[in-house]
Amino acid sequence: ANIWTDVWVRWRGEGHGVRVGQYKQPMFLDELTSDRYTLFMEQGLPSSFALARRIGAEYSYATPHWRFSLSAYDGNLRGLQKGAGGVGRVVWTPWAQPGDLLHLALSAGSESPDGDIARFSSRVEQSGIGRTRLDTGVLTGVDRIRRTGLEALWIRGPFTAQGEYLRADLSRRNAGDAALGGWYAQLGWFVSGDHSSYKDGALEIPDLGEDGRAVEIAARISALDLDDGSVRGGDTRNYTLGANWYLGKHVRLAANYVHVDGERRGVDVQPDVL
């Protein structure tokens, strides 16, 4: 079970869909996009609040310009991220043509964490970099976590602009409520003239043309604030430059440079990570 990720069955018909099993919950565009197709090697800082994969049941309905999803969930197959909750997402695509698309979305959810505890952390958009970790530590007395997310995606020829805001409001007993949040904005450019692709409310494998090769450069700024009241997890703003070299549909070489401007409990953290 430790290696299982997406394990689900789904029925679809006339725009309606029902899915049962373990799947990515309908919140946070960067999470819903496969890591094979994301602009950067790691997700933006707001991913600290993402629900990721949970076991549950989802109903969805899609039209040419709208997509609605509603999901009820609990823990996952790894026995982590325990807590029952529900989340909904509404996506509007006023226009959606290959190489010319606008995606706007709103999501909201509520969760009752198992054992009334919660924890949020981040490794500054480069996995394995422990020394720059932001971490709230274990928060006790958490009755409920309410998440809210905003998404925007614009594809215009070789350019892709994407941004999200994600917020977590914690209702706590005897410790005071807390509001934590983060956002990012990023821009990608296919120097080779190719363009990003989109399907079912998320990014798909780029349109790489006949030879299947492409070069893309990208920039991102993102922020995360895990400080509010008695919660002192730190805050940071990151600046990232990236390059992707596609050698076909299944091979991508990527490099990212991240400058971190962070602080946690009075200690400044400003590393450069490659």
PLM regions: where:
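Outer-membrane beta-barrel pore domains
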Residues: 117-274
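Outer membrane beta-barrel
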Residues: 1-114, 180-210, 216-229, 234
